[in-house]
Structure formats: C-alpha cells, structure tokens
C-alpha cells in the first residue's frame, strides 16, 4: 500500500508538471507581420528553448536582437483567431527578415492556419502581437558547464542555459565566495557566460537573475553544480497580472493611415485591379503638382482594387477620404469592400480634382475585410486619377500600437508566501538590455546596503535536483500502476 501511495504521488507530480498554468498578459497590443513555414530549423539559434508543446517561431534579426527574446512567448492575433508561440530562432535572409521597422514572425503552417487562411495568402500584414507569460507551472531549469578543457570546474569560466522560464531573461549576475562585487554574465541566444574578470570563482556562489518583466531571483549554489544535466532551480518567474491589461483583448493591428500617398503603404498592393487599358501608380499628374498618384484608364466595369494580404479589421475605421478626378463627369462611380459594388458614391466625380469623404459604415463593411475597390460602374470607359487615399480612425482606435519598441512591462510583483523573501538588488549602473541589447563585455556591479531597492526578488538554494524527462516519469508511473492494480 505504501508503494502504491508513493507511485500515486509520483504520478500526480508528473501530471502537475505537464499542466500549463494560465498565461499572463505582459504588454500592450503591438503591430507586426506573420508568414508561415513548412519546415523549422532542427537546431534553432536559441539554445535555451524547451517549448514543451508550445509552438516555436522565428523573428527577424532586429527583433531577435542577439537573442534577448529567446524563450519569450507571444500571443498572435489574425483574422481567424489567436495562437501562442515561443521565440526560438532568427531569420536573416530576405527583406522581411532584414527590415527593422516591425516584428516579423515566422510560424509553422499549422499555427498560421489557426489565425489566417494559408490557401488565400502567404502573409498577415495586420498581425497583432502581445507579450505573454509561457504558462509553465514547473520550475526554471538550468544546465551548467565549465570550460571545454575541464567542464566540471568553474574557477575561470561558467556557462548556464536556463529553460522552462515563464518569461525571457534579460540579465544574470554572479557573486562568488569573498567577492565584494557582483559581475555580469554575457548573454547570447539564451546562453549566459561568465569569464574570470578579477576573481576566481569559489563556492558558495550566488546568481542574481532578472526577467524581461523586471522580476528578480537570487539562486544560491552551495557547491559546484552538476554539469551537463538539467537541474531544478526551485523557482519560477510569476509575473503579476497588470490590471490595465486584464481586459485588454487584442484584435488585429490597426491599419496604416494611408493606402496611397506618393506610393502604396506597407502591405497594400494594387495588382488585382481589373478591366483597364492603362494603369500606373507613378503618375506625376497630381493635385499638388508634386509627388505621384494613380492613373488608370478603366474599361466599362473596370476597377482599381487595393488588397492587403492577411485581411484587415474595420472596427476602428471611421471614414475613407481620397482625392479624385476623371476624364469626364460621372455619377456612376462606386467604392466598395469585398467583391460586390453596392451603390454609387455621392457626390459626382468630375474632371477637376475633388476630395471625397465617405463613412466606412456606408460602404456596408464586414468586421474583417481583404480589399477595397474604386469601380467604374458603367459600360463606358473612363480615365481616373486617385491620390491621398486615407482612413480616419474612430475615437477609441489604439493609435499607439508599438512595432519595434521594447514593450515589455516593468512588472514588479509582490513577494508571495512560500516563494522566498525579498532580496537586495545590486547597483545596476550598466549592462542588461538597453536599446541595442546585451553588452558583449562583463560589467561589475556594486552591492551596497545604502542602495537597496524594493525590487521584487525571491531566494532559491541549490539542492541540485536532477530532472528526469517529465514524459518518461509519467509513462513509467502509468506502467507500474497498471501492473499493481
């Protein structure tokens, strides 16, 4: 009976570690792009990713930022729904990967199909992303190594790879026996390394670990850690829910204000325009006399059609305005979403430049659309010029959506019972993430009782719990229990 109870306990613990906790929203909604991929790198750039069922994603080089987002989870919102992915790799080939204007997520086909329609398009240009916790219920794991010549010693060199962390880690400090100061570890792609700067590393030693949300943990190593095996570090980052974000449900990203102004805005194409004798989006015959506009010689029932891959949301669009002139006055000109013209616009379009403003609601829009068309709704041909095509937003539109900003929230949750006590924070005069990412040189941090902060921190000691794979323990437990009962 005692053996059965022990095995049942083991089974419960295995199941518990498999269950994901609820995710916590950690940022405002940002504007990004997503593309699908059929294959993923079997050896991703991030060395610390242990996704445990969370789909992995790549990021463009600028957003990846030397690996500062390795292991960070993001909730992505497209026209068909949401999915959560974890950053594991970087892409550096092609314009989408080398641009530095916005986040570009490369996600598995099956995840893209949850949020978009891969059979219709290969990009989502109005993707919304939000930083979230990864929802791990177990503890952070660490794999320690020493120098390659002597991997079990740490006197001059120490490397540690953290995994299973709820949020990405932005800074790691270490303080050895008799050291007066903390020294920083250099982070790259999820691997944190310390090289001897002024003191040899002797134990006990303490690691001071800070997440991207500002939560801090001190981990004391009473003796040399076991190398090359995952160790349960007996702590987990638990970012506190932020009241202003709790009800912040992200929809698709807000459209750029202009569809066309001296050129098409990012994500818009006019290649599906139809029934025309001549078409250019670089005409110099503009209203202002400078820049460019669109000029199309439309046949009867021809149209200038602007499409956006991955669709777009109309909820925050109030009005559509544009400058137009035609070769002849016409009362048979329509503007419409989708594929069917509903009614002609008012006022009459004329042979002189006119600014037209239309209510988006009057265009009989759906919540999500994929195109908007300027249509010659008659049998006779007409020559048209279009310029300055833009949206006016509703009052509640999220106008401040970040694109490439570091938008992690400086989250400082209170220490909860059972997780340790508040620790003093080393002076953070340099190092960590600051605009350009993590510095390549070690920095020295003073530890002064006069400069203590009320930064949240928790203590954990190195009991050196070596981890067996969760699934292995789980199936062994099931097998033994089936034999016993």
Swiss-Prot record:
Residues 414-431 have a biased composition (Low complexity). The keyword Glycoprotein applies. The chain crosses the membrane at residues 465-485. Glycans are attached at residues 117, 365, 454. Disulfide bonds join 29-70, 73-134. It is a single-pass type I membrane protein. Residues 26-139 form the Expansin-like EG45 domain. It is found in: Membrane. Residues 22-464 are extracellular. Residues 1-21 form the signal peptide. One of its GO terms (cellular component) is membrane. Keywords: Disulfide bond, Glycoprotein, Membrane, Signal, Transmembrane, Transmembrane helix. Residues 408-436 are annotated as: Disordered. PANTHER family: EXPANSIN-LIKE PROTEIN 8-RELATED, PTHR31836. May serve to lubricate the movement of the cellulose microfibrils during cell growth and wall extension and/or may serve to maintain the fluid state of the slug cell wall. Belongs to the expansin family. Expansin A subfamily. This is Expansin-like protein 8. The lineage of its organism: Eukaryota, Amoebozoa, Evosea, Eumycetozoa, Dictyostelia.
């Amino acid at each position: 009976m005692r053996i059965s109870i022990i095995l049942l306990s083991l089974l419960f613990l295995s199941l518990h570690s498999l269950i994901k906790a609820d995710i916590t929203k950690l940022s405002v909604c940002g504007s990004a792009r997503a593309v699908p991929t059929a294959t993923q790198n079997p050896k991703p750039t991030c060395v610390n990713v242990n996704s445990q069922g969370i789909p992995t994603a790549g990021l463009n080089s600028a957003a990846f930022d030397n690996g500062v987002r390795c292991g960070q989870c993001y909730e992505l919102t497209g026209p068909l729904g949401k999915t959560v992915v974890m950053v594991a790799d970087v892409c550096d080939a092609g314009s989408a990967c080398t641009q530095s204007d916005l986040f570009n997520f490369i996600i598995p086909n099956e995840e893209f199909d949850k949020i978009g329609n891969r059979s219709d398009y290969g990009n989502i240009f109005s993707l919304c992303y939000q930083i979230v916790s990864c929802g791990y219920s177990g503890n952070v794991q660490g794999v320690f190594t020493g120098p390659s010549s002597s991997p079990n010693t740490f006197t001059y060199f120490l490397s540690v790879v953290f995994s299973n962390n709820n949020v990405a880690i932005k800074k790691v400090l270490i303080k050895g026996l008799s050291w007066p100061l903390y020294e920083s570890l250099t982070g790259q792609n999820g691997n944190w390394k310390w090289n001897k700067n002024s003191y040899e590393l002797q134990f006990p030693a303490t690691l001071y670990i800070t997440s991207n949300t500002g939560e801090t943990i001190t981990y004391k190593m009473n003796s040399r850690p076991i190398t090359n095996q995952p160790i349960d570090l007996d702590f987990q980052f638990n970012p506190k829910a932020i009241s202003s974000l709790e009800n912040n449900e992200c929809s698709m990203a807000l459209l750029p204000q202009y569809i066309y102004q001296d050129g098409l805005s990012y994500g818009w194409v006019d290649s599906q325009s139809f029934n025309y004798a001549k078409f250019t989006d670089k005409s110099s015959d503009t209203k202002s006399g400078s820049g460019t506009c669109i000029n199309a010689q439309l046949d009867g029932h021809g149209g200038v059609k602007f499409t956006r891959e991955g669709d777009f949301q109309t909820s925050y669009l109030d009005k559509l305005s544009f400058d137009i002139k035609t070769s002849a006055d016409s009362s048979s000109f329509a503007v419409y979403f989708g594929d069917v013209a509903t009614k002609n616009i008012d006022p009459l379009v004329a042979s002189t430049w006119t600014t037209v403003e239309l209510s988006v609601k009057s265009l009989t829009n759906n919540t999500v659309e994929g195109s908007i068309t300027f249509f010659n709704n008659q049998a006779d041909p007409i020559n048209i010029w279009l310029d300055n095509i833009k949206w006016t937003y509703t009052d509640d539109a999220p106008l401040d959506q970040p694109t490439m900003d570091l938008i992690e929230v400086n989250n400082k949750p209170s220490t909860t019972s059972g997780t340790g006590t508040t620790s003093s924070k080393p002076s953070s005069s340099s190092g960590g993430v600051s605009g350009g990412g993590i510095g390549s040189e070690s920095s020295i941090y003073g530890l002064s009782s006069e400069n203590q902060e009320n930064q949240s921190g928790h203590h954990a000691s190195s009991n050196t719990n070596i981890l067996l794979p969760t699934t292995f323990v789980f199936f062994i437990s099931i097998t033994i229990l089936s034999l016993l009962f």
